[in-house]
């Protein structure tokens, strides 16, 4: 047995104790895996190709950072923001990541707290759940331009599939132009009047906004070893067309199905979708090739990535002709992401491009490109597995269009029923072994 991380050799007693503990742990896991293997079909072990996290930290919620959008969030000065986020798995310890990735000046956080949200519809926390967060033991931290920082771990009981309130006090003048944001939250966040309300049970006279800012991840140490599945995608992953505040994006619904089926064996499923995102060109947020390392590989506990990208590369050629790309270019970009994921030991799952006939962005040429890309995704044999969103969402009588019952109205994005159909179509056993050690 190899030991590392010690400045001096372990004595014989310590080595013997460690070896004995390791044998007991191995036996326990062997029994658990053996029992679950009896319950699963032969296809399930594909998920075991991915790596297992060594740090113990797993992301339970994420949002992909974007540069500020004028007018989306007002300029802030001596105010507190309270962000409501929905967990996927639970844990006994918690830490957060704050991002100044697109900031134009150092960002001072004067106070930071986490609590259980009383309701996603109001800026009130459950009494007795508030916990102050620190950074190197200090309540305040200045985040350099372009940097991402972690809070100190705190003992905090996180329940799966619940809402947390993360409150950040910004004592200095913080213009909108320097805020790192996530445009499309589908969840209200709250801005206080003047003052530090980070630890307050409720906000007086709050202003609600539908986006997130500064917070890019909430991470936990689960009671049972598990890992993270990252959904990388565009507006269909970001949840456009679903109902605000209900957490009806397909990654949310997949996470709920996994937890309800496997409980603490379930991995987390975190959402790194960006509305309008493309593979090869920026539009809202960095292109997927540029953000893959930050938004996938850097996530705590990542072991699997689901790639739902490419439709905007096809569709936006109608409105941005000079950025038109071919199916071959899209396939090349997807192949790059697959290779980069595999190089880091991740299981990589592909998603077919859904129907979009009848939409503002539709063209016959775009449909030809979509079909060619889907042919590659289904039959290229580069992905470890494929989720066929196209087959789930299309109208059998007109396969280039969304099934009317699943159409949010724009003929591109599903509604709540469509997102539920996507989640229900996914074979959960593909993901079970991400919740077990190898």
Regions found by a protein language model. Give the residues of each.
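N-terminal secretory signal peptides that target proteins for export/translocation
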Residues: 1-25
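N-terminal secretory targeting modules
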Residues: 5, 34-35, 46-232, 242-244, ...
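Bacterial N-terminal signal peptides
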Residues: 30-42
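Alpha-helical scaffolding within the catalytic cores
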Residues: 80, 213, 251-258, 284-300, ...
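Structural recognition of the beta-strand scaffold that forms the well-ordered cores
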Residues: 95, 228-233, 237, 267-273, ...
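Catalytic nucleophile-elbow at a beta strand-turn-alpha helix junction centered on a G-D-S/GDSL motif
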Residues: 226-251, 275-278
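Oxyanion-hole/transition-state-stabilizing segment in secreted/luminal serine hydrolases
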Residues: 242, 274-329
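Catalytic His-Asp segment of secreted/periplasmic serine-dependent ester chemistry enzymes
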Residues: 289, 315, 354-438
């Amino acid at each position: 047995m190899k030991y590392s991380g010690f400045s001096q050799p372990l004595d014989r007693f310590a080595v013997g104790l460690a070896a004995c503990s390791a044998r007991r742990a191995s036996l326990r896991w062997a029994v658990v895996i053996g029992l679950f293997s009896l319950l699963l079909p032969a296809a399930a072990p594909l998920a075991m190709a991915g790596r297992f996290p060594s740090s113990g930290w797993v992301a339970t919620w994420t949002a992909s950072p974007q540069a500020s959008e004028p007018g989306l969030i007002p300029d802030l000065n001596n105010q507190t923001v309270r962000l409501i986020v929905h967990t996927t798995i639970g844990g006994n310890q918690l830490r957060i990541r704050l991002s100044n990735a697109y900031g134009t000046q150092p960002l001072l956080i004067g106070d930071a707290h986490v609590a259980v949200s009383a309701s996603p519809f109001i800026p009130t926390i459950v009494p007795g759940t508030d916990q102050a967060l620190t950074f190197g033991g200090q309540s305040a931290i200045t985040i350099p331009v372009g940097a991402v920082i972690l809070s100190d771990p705190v003992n905090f009981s996180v329940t799966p599939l619940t809402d947390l309130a993360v409150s950040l006090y910004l004592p200095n003048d913080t213009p909108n132009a320097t805020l790192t944001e996530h445009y499309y939250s589908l969840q209200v966040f709250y801005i206080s009047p003047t003052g530090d309300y980070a630890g307050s049970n409720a906000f007086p006279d709050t202003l609600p906004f539908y986006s997130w800012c500064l917070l890019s991840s909430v991470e936990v140490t689960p009671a049972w070893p598990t890992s993270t599945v990252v959904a990388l995608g565009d507006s269909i992953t970001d949840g456009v067309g679903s109902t605000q505040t209900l957490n009806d994006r397909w990654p949310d619904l997949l996470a709920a199905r996994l937890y309800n089926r496997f409980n603490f064996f379930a991995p987390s499923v975190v959402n790194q979708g960006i509305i309008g995102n493309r593979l090869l060109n920026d539009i809202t947020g960095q292109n997927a090739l540029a953000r893959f390392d930050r938004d996938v590989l850097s996530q705590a506990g990542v072991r699997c990535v689901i790639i739902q990208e490419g439709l905007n590369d096809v569709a936006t050629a109608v409105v941005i002709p000079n950025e038109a790309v071919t199916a071959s270019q899209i396939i090349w970009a997807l192949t790059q992401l697959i290779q980069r994921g595999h190089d880091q030991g991740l299981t990589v799952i592909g998603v077919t491009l859904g129907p979009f006939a009848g939409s503002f962005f539709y063209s016959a040429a775009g449909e030809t490109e979509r079909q060619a890309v889907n042919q590659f995704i289904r039959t290229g044999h580069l992905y470890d597995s494929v989720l066929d969103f196209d087959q789930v969402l299309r109208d059998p009588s007109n396969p280039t269009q969304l099934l009317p019952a699943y159409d949010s109205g724009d003929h591109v994005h599903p509604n709540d029923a469509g997102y539920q159909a996507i989640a229900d179509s996914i074979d959960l056993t593909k993901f079970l072994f991400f919740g077990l050690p190898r």
